[in-house]
């Protein structure tokens, strides 16, 4: 796949196949319900993890959805063509995911009471995860060397554009108590506490026992063994897991946020690159 073959939607680069002009039009005309819950992420920031977490929290620990329904059907992407095929099968409250920046959300979202869980992730981890994903996904551009891929990332010449623009669009959205910001890192460090924050935000009074059950079933080990979640159902012609595993255990990286909370730095060898501008 070459960059020239990516679908350009209002300046946003998207991979063809899963995204079509029709699916994007459907997303813009989508009727958002007040009870809908959106997990919003920049690519490679915990989307699949949230597709595991959301149905378990919304269904108070019932494992049936995550054991019987592929993650892309149980919590579908707003912008992908699959949504049209499964939307009528989604139970209420509906869980959905999207990589859209805020300004790309449908008008019905902005007039609804739908809630958003925005998952933020260390940008260096995003780059590394995305780099490996590009190596295994045949529908994406060849990433080249890691140095070249970092340059593309900083330029926004990657799926869904610049990370900083995505993050700022949601940080600046005036959604009040409709949005919860949570980090991938706090989920890694203490998943039960993160699940408690999510369940409280969604108005679920889950017991400690249910929280532990959800945490156990959303662990790296459990998800890696779950065919409904590890993307092993996707044909090799689209994802070659011999080149890289889709679920890769997070090892942590060198990053920091300045005391002003407005600048992020990315350590690339001895080089520091400012990402927030």
Report the location of each language-model feature:
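Short, solvent-exposed polar/charged micro-motifs at secondary-structure junctions
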Residues: 105-107, 190-193, 221-222
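A generic structural signal for alpha-helix starts
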Residues: 45, 186-189, 205
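Marks the mature luminal ectodomains of secretory-pathway proteins
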Residues: 198-204
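Short, conserved secondary-structure transition motifs
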Residues: 77-78, 218-225
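C-terminal, well-structured subdomains that either form a transmembrane helix-short loop-helix hairpin
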Residues: 183-194, 198
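Hydrophobic alpha-helical segments
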Residues: 201, 217, 272-276
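PAPS-dependent sulfotransferase catalytic domain
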Residues: 1-182, 195, 209, 228-277
């Amino acid at each position: 796949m070459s960059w020239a073959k990516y679908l350009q939607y209002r300046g946003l680069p998207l991979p063809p196949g899963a995204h079509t002009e029709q699916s994007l039009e459907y997303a813009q005309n989508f009727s958002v319900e007040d009870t809908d819950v959106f997990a919003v992420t920049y690519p490679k920031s915990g989307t699949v993890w949230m597709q595991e977490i959301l149905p378990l929290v919304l269904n108070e620990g019932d494992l049936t959805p995550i054991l019987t329904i592929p993650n892309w059907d149980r919590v579908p992407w707003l912008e992908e063509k699959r949504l049209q095929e499964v939307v009528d099968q989604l139970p209420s409250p509906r869980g959905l995911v999207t990589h859209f920046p805020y300004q790309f959300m449908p008008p019905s979202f902005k007039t609804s009471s739908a809630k958003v869980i925005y998952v933020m992730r260390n940008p260096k981890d995003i780059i590394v995860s995305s780099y490996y994903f590009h190596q295994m996904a045949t529908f994406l551009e060849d990433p080249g060397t890691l140095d070249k891929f970092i340059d593309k990332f900083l330029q926004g010449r990657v799926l869904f554009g610049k990370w900083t623009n995505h993050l700022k669009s949601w940080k600046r959205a005036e959604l009040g108590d409709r949005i919860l910001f949570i980090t991938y890192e706090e989920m890694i460090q203490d998943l039960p506490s993160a699940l408690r924050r999510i369940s409280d935000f969604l108005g679920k009074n889950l017991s400690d026992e249910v929280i532990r059950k959800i945490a156990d079933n959303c662990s790296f080990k459990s998800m890696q063994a779950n065919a409904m979640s590890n993307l092993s159902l996707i044909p090799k012609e689209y994802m070659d897991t011999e080149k890289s595993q889709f679920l890769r255990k997070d090892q942590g990286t060198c990053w920091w946020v300045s005391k002003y909370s407005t600048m992020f730095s990315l350590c690339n060898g001895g080089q520091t690159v400012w990402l927030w501008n």
